Amino acid sequence: MRRITPFFPFFVLLVSHFSLAISYPLPPEGSRLVGQPVTIAVPQNNTQPLESFAARYGQGLSNMLEANPGVDVFLPQSGSTLVVPQQLILPDTVREGIVVNVAEMRLYYYPAGTNTVEVLPIGIGQAGRETPRNWVTAVERKQDGPVWVPTANTRREYAKEGKTLPAMVPAGPDNPMGLYAIYIGRLYAIHGTNANFGIGLRVSQGCIRLRNDDIKYLFDHVPVGTRVQIIDRPVKFSVEPDGSRWLEVHEPLSRNRAEFESDKKVPLPVTPVLRTFIKGDDVDTSRVNEVLERRSGMPVNISAGRPGL
């Protein structure tokens, strides 16, 4: 049974009361499962939208929606419970620098010389202006008070909606890039926002958007030259040291406009390695099917004869 608690039972808030960076101790060798699931109670006479709970508990809106199907995004029901997906499987890649998994809309930062990983929710490029995927680059430079220069294509798109964009938006509180930017490669940035929504959504022009406390933390701690890897893995899985098998499935990103506008689920990418993993004799097949269909964004123990979440 999940414990109902209004507190953070296992992680540290890094910047302020509403800071979103969650610090997890790295698991022992051979393990990729970190954290614990938490359930919180929505206060009586609640007046806050789901975004407020997502921000308070270091999640993106998509993470909360996956974990709580059917929840009212504008006003979660007073007295109800919300699952906060604070348990996760670390991406199966090098634990170095920054790793962004666009499918789960999370950024992982492995600070050098520590035994921790900081996990932050992100917003990514909207359909047709995708954030790059399967890309390894580095932090080229950092800018306190970035200037936004919309591309000609961006200005045309805004014009179609009857909006006029200037050739340049100066630094300041009205800048869509927020107050800090970390430039990766030549064309993209990890930056803040001037809005109070959009984290966990596909809303940017292709860059990676963070809440303002989070980008301030990264800006202060991530050195120029840091390795940055962007992956697209809606399915993560792990065999833990005790032999248990865990599967975490997110809703994949749509691959085109038709998929984006369709009511049908986007097909999951099933690699040969994943197929072997879920077909093993020590796996509960019915539970696997449930996890693949449900796509809760949370790790589930799919081992035969073992309890799930």
Curated annotation (Swiss-Prot):
GO terms for biological process: cell wall organization; peptidoglycan-protein cross-linking; regulation of cell shape. Gene3D superfamilies: L,D-transpeptidase catalytic domain-like. Keywords: Cell shape, Cell wall biogenesis/degradation, Glycosyltransferase, Hydrolase, Peptidoglycan synthesis, Periplasm, Signal, Transferase. GO terms for cellular component: periplasmic space. CDD domains: YkuD_like. Belongs to the YkuD family. This is Probable L,D-transpeptidase ErfK/SrfK.
